[in-house]
């Protein structure tokens, strides 16, 4: 969805058009945290795009309540570009193969980082196999770490859904960690950065296991004009040393390709046996 807003001028000269873009994401953590995280970078990006395109660029932001809502918004062109988790990228490509990767987030120059499975700090559990007969908290049903990679990892340890006493999907990563810390579930899966934030807040959890994940892609809708996509990509790939960029991607961005997410496709396929 790309809108053109006309400036009303006091002269009969042709009005200059502003480019208005909508950025979309979903709340893997609290929505207020999500907005606070991205707004400064989006302001930076709109200014740089304006310089590159020679037109004023306005970027609006929308935060979907659920993963599927965010996926649908990008697939339909309701938003022009988005930041998704890897599994959401795989899903949105199935809905609209015209989606393109703008760039991937960098983790110290790499395209991989860690997801974690946690237990209560005082838990006696030392192995994933110890979870048989106990409870597990997953994130969203479409979450890369919170579902697909966690379930794949559990399967490798010989644990499937029938082996658990109970399990549930809690949505956000922070809710998973808090539930485990409160003793509502024996274990749960969340991203490492959220784990560190919860530890800093005093939530009594510890890491039982960790696993590789692929960094998040920034994606362009199939309707985003090519010149805007190319300008956005150039800005993101050349801005790794900008402090404002490090707020959303600590080490900047890398060139991305569809094959970077084969690890996730494999995990999603494996999780069907869970």
Feature annotation, model-predicted:
Residues 80-82, 89-114:
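Short beta-strand-centered segments that line the small-molecule binding cleft or hinge
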Residues 46-54, 75, 79, 155, ...:
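Sec-exported extracytoplasmic/periplasmic mature domains
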Residues 1-78, 246-274:
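N-terminal hydrophobic or amphipathic helices and topogenic motifs
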Residues 18-31, 103, 107-119, 200-242, ...:
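Periplasmic-binding protein-like
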């Amino acid at each position: 969805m790309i809108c053109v807003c006309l400036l009303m001028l006091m002269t009969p000269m042709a009005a200059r058009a502003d480019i208005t873009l909508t950025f979309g994401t979903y709340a893997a953590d609290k929505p207020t945290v999500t907005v606070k995280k991205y707004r400064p970078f989006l302001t930076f990006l709109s200014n740089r795009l304006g310089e590159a395109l020679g037109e004023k660029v306005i970027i609006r932001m929308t935060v979907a309540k659920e993963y599927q809502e965010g996926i649908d918004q990008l697939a339909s062109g309701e938003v022009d570009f988005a930041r998704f988790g890897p599994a959401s990228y795989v899903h949105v490509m199935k809905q609209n193969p015209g989606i393109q990767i703008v760039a991937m987030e960098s983790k110290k120059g790499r395209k991989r980082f860690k997801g974690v499975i946690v237990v209560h700090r005082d838990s006696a559990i030392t192995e994933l196999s110890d979870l048989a007969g106990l409870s597990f908290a997953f994130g969203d049903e479409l979450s890369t770490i919170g579902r697909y990679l966690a379930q794949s990892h559990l399967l490798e340890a010989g644990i499937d859904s029938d082996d658990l006493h109970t399990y549930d999907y809690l949505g956000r990563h922070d809710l998973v960690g808090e539930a485990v810390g409160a003793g509502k579930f024996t274990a749960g899966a969340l991203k490492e950065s959220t784990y560190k934030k919860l530890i800093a807040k005093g939530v009594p959890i510890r890491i039982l296991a960790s696993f590789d994940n692929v960094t998040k892609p920034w994606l362009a809708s199939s309707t985003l004009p090519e010149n805007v996509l190319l300008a956005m990509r150039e800005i993101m790939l050349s801005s790794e040393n900008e402090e404002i960029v490090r707020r959303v991607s600590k080490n900047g961005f890398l060139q991305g390709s569809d094959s970077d997410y084969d690890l996730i496709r494999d995990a999603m396929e494996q999780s069907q046996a869970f």
